Structures are given as C-alpha cells and as structure tokens.
Regions:
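Conserved PLP-enzyme active-site core in the AAT-like
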Residues: 52-206
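Conserved N-terminal alpha-helix of the aminotransferase class I/II PLP-enzyme fold
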Residues: 1-53
Length: 206
C-alpha cells in the first residue's frame, strides 16, 4: 500500500542497516518517477517542503551566477511560500525583488518582469529568475516567455510546478519550457499530495 509506506513520511535515511536499503529503494523509485514526469535527470528526495526548496533555489542561483546579488521572483507564487522565503533570507546577503501580478489578468506582468530583469542584468546584479507554472490563482503563467528571458540574459531559471497537475492535466514539462524547448535550469515542487495524507498540513515533501 503506497499510502502507508513509511518511506514517504520522511526524507531522512534511517541508520538501522536492516531498514536503510528499503528506504533508499523507495527514494530511488520516487526520484525515477519524478524524473520521467519532468524530464529532469536529477531529482532530489527531498527537502522539507516546497517553500524551503524554493528558498534553497535562491542560493543555487547565486552560486551558479556568483557576480549576481539579486533574484527576481514572481509575486504570483503562493503567499505561504513568499513568507518562508522572506523569513529565510532575512539577515543574509540574498536579495529578492518581487514582480507583481497584473490586477486585471492575475498573471505576472511580463513587461515589468523583463524591464526589471534587463535593468538588473545591465548592472550585473541579476542572479536568476523564479516563476510558477500554475500561480496561486490557478492561472497558467507564460512560462515559455519567462524561460526565453532567462536564456537571453544568461541567468538560471527556476520553475515552480505541481507534479499532480503535470501528471494529469496535460501541462508541458519544465524540461521543455521555452520557445525552443530548452527548458528551465531548476525545478521546485511539492510532492505531499502524491502519496501523503493531509495530516493538518504536513509533513511536506519538497
């Protein structure tokens, strides 16, 4: 029974040798399935939840693009994710500039995203851009245009996706975002609803 498999309940590998191999097998199966679903070769298993994973992706962007100091993030992400990011970057050198959603459409304003990205890039401050595939209002963002923007500016791109919607909704996998199908560099998602019961909001599987 997948739902009762304790391997889904935690990302930690137990120290007991008689359990380790089964847990590692479970994590390998999970990573392999997500790899097939997203088209990405490397899938971790896992961080605490999507919000923490998103915050870590900021650090990855800064390490991949060391001259940059600022990551552009769409404000149409889930409010809880935004709160966690702002909490974890407090008292650090990580800088985030939020791009608001259009009041009429509910989508991230691409023109404003592009304007801010080009300004930061010209000042050699841009380290990466982050955007959701499906935003907090349930709307599909223009992932191809945003991916093309990061490609043209030569900075890492991070896409926040929902594996359940990707598996059942016919959405384009993040490995094929962009007008030329070049894909994003990093993906962030939440896997709790793949196999774990709600349990008052946790545990997560980022």
């Amino acid at each position: 029974n997948i739902l009762e498999n304790p391997g889904w309940y935690t990302s930690y590998t137990p120290y007991q040798p008689e359990r380790s191999q089964g847990t590692l097998q479970t994590l390998w199966v999970y990573s392999s399935c997500l790899s097939q679903l997203t088209g990405f070769e490397a899938i971790n298993a896992s961080l605490y939840e999507r919000s923490t994973c998103l915050a870590e992706s900021l650090n990855v962007c800064l390490r991949l693009h060391r001259k940059g100091t600022t990551v552009l993030v769409s404000e149409s992400i889930f409010p809880g994710d935004k709160e966690v990011v702002e909490t974890l970057i407090r008292e650090t050198d990580v800088l985030v500039e939020w791009v608001p959603a259009d009041d009429k459409t509910g989508l991230t304003s691409f023109d404003e995203f592009k304007s801010k990205a080009e300004r930061l890039s010209n000042d050699k401050l841009l380290a990466g851009i982050i955007f959701p595939q499906v935003n907090s209002l349930g709307l599909l963002e223009n992932v191809d245009a945003l991916t093309d923007l990061s490609t043209s500016l030569k900075v890492p791109s991070v896409a926040i996706f929902d594996p359940m919607l990707l598996a059942t909704g016919g959405l384009k996998p993040p490995s094929r975002f962009g007008s030329e199908g070049q894909g994003v560099d990093i993906i962030v998602g939440e896997g709790q609803h793949l196999a774990i019961g709600p349990n008052y909001g946790g545990p997560g599987l980022g």
